[in-house]
């Protein structure tokens, strides 16, 4: 194996949206392949037809591309080891099923699901771990053939099970977990390798695929550890060398300390959700990569090239990786601050147009206005969709202040500051951020009010918010007429509250 070219695979099932955990698996395989100048294979594991979702494979491919992950072989681009969908490899699997049947390493099993469940219930009642019990125990070859013929005559469809040898230790040196081993009598007995509908089971198909596609390393989540001894059993039965395995820790919710559940709607954990927010793909890739992997140094912001250069599976954590939504938001925000402004403009404009705030084909003047708006809020955003809420004041009619805002400007000196500022703005012909800040300074000189007592009432009265971007830039984009309307409405509201 040491002399073989590095070939890894990401093999999703088309059963739903791309989860952050699966995205991490794809990223780690991608980084490992690129770091070692190897090959990344995309394989669609759609053998379980009952669980497949229509369009699921296409969705996986689209979201992987959005994350900036590309591959060298796959169902969309082909390659020398195809087909790359399990549903198109049924004849290949059948060849090896037949081989194991002929060699006596596998057999037809006719036990019904009802019989198997009754067997498991009995074992549980006896305090025994549920496992399959060989149904032909003590029978001769002729008796087995007769029993199978009778079952077929009744219309029963068989599965195919592989023999698990007794007293065998299945062990491997995991590049993440270290040395792992399982005794053959602890893995549930002879397991199914072909279902009643003729399709292979996961633990059989994955071995055939990995071997024939010459996969050198299998990097996957540690929920697959219990599958590995079963797969090693298939490798041994077929006389094949197994790849190197590396099992990455599962992801937990940092808030609860429990395994991240796909049903937990309080956490954004599907790549499609980030695409809908119109996040840049780089921070999603960064945050996914940092889940369970510690790079050299203190930096948490990397380019793709830096990630590829640094990636080493030896630095993968043996402890569960905590998914921290706030951390991901922070990483997104760091990228927003340095993102290409034209790219950011395109993304944010799309959000504003979707919300009906900007027309489909804005005139050059309006386009420049949107550019200034996006630049003004870039440092505050983690996702460009946030521009819709952040900039509402620029697209709505003047509204009354909230109770909290009124309480803030009911304090002494707020009204005099607002009245004087309105007078200073009245004098302005050139309504620019620089001139507006000059008007604020003039208000300070005329009233003697300064600091927070000056700036907070003016910010609230003009922008209808206690926080926000630079107040001069914000008012310039609003325009003088809108700002004056806000000031008039604020003074009216103060009068109604008895503040003169």
Swiss-Prot record:
Keyword line: Aminoacyl-tRNA synthetase, ATP-binding, Cytoplasm, Ligase, Nucleotide-binding, Protein biosynthesis
Gene Ontology MF, one: tRNA binding
PROSITE patterns: AA_TRNA_LIGASE_I (PS00178)
CC terms in the record's Gene Ontology section: cytosol
Positions of ATP binding: 262
Keyword GTP-binding: no
Reaction catalyzed: tRNA(Glu) + L-glutamate + ATP = L-glutamyl-tRNA(Glu) + AMP + diphosphate
UniProt enzyme class: ligase
SUPFAM superfamilies cross-referenced by the UniProt entry: An anticodon-binding domain of class I aminoacyl-tRNA synthetases, Nucleotidylyl transferase
Motif ('HIGH' region): 12-22
Main location: cytoplasm
Subcellular location as annotated: Cytoplasm
Gene Ontology biological process terms, A to Z: glutamyl-tRNA aminoacylation
Pfam families in the cross-refs: Anticodon_2, tRNA-synt_1c
Protein origin, superkingdom: Bacteria
EC number: 6.1.1.17
CDD domains: GluRS_core (cd00808)
Motif ('KMSKS' region): 259-263
InterPro entries to which the protein is assigned, alphabetical: aa-tRNA-synth_I_cd-bd, aa-tRNA-synth_I_codon-bd_sub2, aa-tRNA-synth_I_CS, aa_tRNA-synth_I_cd-bd_sf, Glu-tRNA-ligase_bac/mito, Glu/Gln-tRNA-synth, Glu/Gln-tRNA-synth_Ib_cat-dom, GluQ/Sye
Job of this protein: Catalyzes the attachment of glutamate to tRNA(Glu) in a two-step reaction: glutamate is first activated by ATP to form Glu-AMP and then transferred to the acceptor end of tRNA(Glu).
Similarity comment: family membership: Belongs to the class-I aminoacyl-tRNA synthetase family. Glutamate--tRNA ligase type 1 subfamily.
Quaternary assembly: Monomer.
UniProt name for this protein: Glutamate--tRNA ligase
Record organism: Lactobacillus delbrueckii subsp. bulgaricus
Gene name of the encoded protein: gltX
């Amino acid at each position: 194996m040491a002399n073989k070219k590095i070939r890894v695979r990401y093999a999703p099932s088309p059963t739903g949206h791309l989860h952050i955990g699966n995205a991490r698996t794809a990223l780690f395989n991608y980084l490992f392949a690129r770091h070692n100048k190897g090959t990344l294979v995309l394989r669609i594991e759609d053998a379980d037809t009952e669980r497949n979702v229509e369009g699921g494979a296409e969705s996986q491919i689209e979201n992987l591309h959005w994350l900036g992950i590309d591959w060298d072989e796959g169902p969309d681009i082909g390659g020398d080891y195809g087909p790359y969908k399990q549903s198109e490899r049924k004849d290949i699997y059948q060849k090896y099923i037949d081989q194991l049947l002929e060699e006596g390493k596998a057999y037809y099993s006719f036990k019904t699901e009802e019989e198997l469940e009754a067997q498991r219930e009995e074992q549980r009642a006896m305090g025994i771990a549920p496992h399959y019990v060989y149904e032909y125990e003590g029978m001769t070859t002729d008796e087995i053939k007769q029993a199978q013929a009778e079952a077929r005559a009744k219309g029963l469809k068989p599965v195919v099970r592989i023999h698990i040898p007794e007293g065998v230790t299945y062990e491997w040196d995991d590049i993440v977990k270290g040395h792992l081993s399982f005794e053959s009598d602890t893995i549930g007995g002879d397991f199914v390798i072909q279902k009643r509908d003729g399709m292979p089971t996961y633990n059989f198909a994955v071995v055939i695929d990995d071997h024939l596609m010459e996969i050198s390393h299998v990097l996957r989540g540690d929920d697959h550890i219990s599958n590995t001894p079963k797969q090693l059993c298939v490798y041994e039965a077929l006389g094949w060398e197994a790849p190197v395995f590396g099992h990455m820790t599962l992801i937990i919710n940092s808030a609860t300390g429990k395994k991240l559940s796909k049903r937990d709607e309080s956490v954004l954990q599907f790549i499609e959700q980030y695409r809908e927010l119109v996040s840049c793909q780089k921070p999603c890739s960064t945050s996914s990569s940092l889940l369970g992997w510690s790079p050299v140094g203190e930096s948490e912001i990397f380019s793709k090239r830096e990630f590829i250069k640094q990636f080493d599976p030896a630095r993968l954590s043996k402890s569960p990786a905590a998914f921290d939504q706030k951390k991901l938001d922070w990483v997104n925000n760091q990228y927003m601050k340095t993102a290409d402004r034209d790219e950011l403009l395109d993304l944010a404009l799309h959000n504003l147009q979707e919300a009906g705030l900007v027309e489909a084909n804005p005139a050059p003047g309006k386009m420049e206005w949107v550019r200034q708006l996006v630049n003004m809020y870039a440092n505050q955003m983690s996702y460009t969709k946030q521009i819709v809420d952040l900039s509402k004041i620029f697209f709505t009619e003047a509204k009354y202040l909230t109770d909290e805002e009124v309480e803030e400007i009911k304090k002494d000196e707020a009204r005099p500051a607002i009245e004087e500022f309105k007078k200073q703005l009245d004098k302005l012909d050139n309504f620019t951020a620089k001139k507006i800040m000059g008007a604020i300074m003039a208000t300070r000189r005329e009233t003697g009010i300064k600091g927070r007592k000056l700036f907070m009432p003016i910010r609230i009265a003009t922008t209808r918010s206690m926080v926000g971007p630079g107040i001069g830039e914000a008012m310039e984009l609003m325009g003088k007429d809108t700002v004056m309307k806000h000031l008039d409405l604020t003074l009216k509201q103060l009068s109604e509250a008895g503040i003169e």
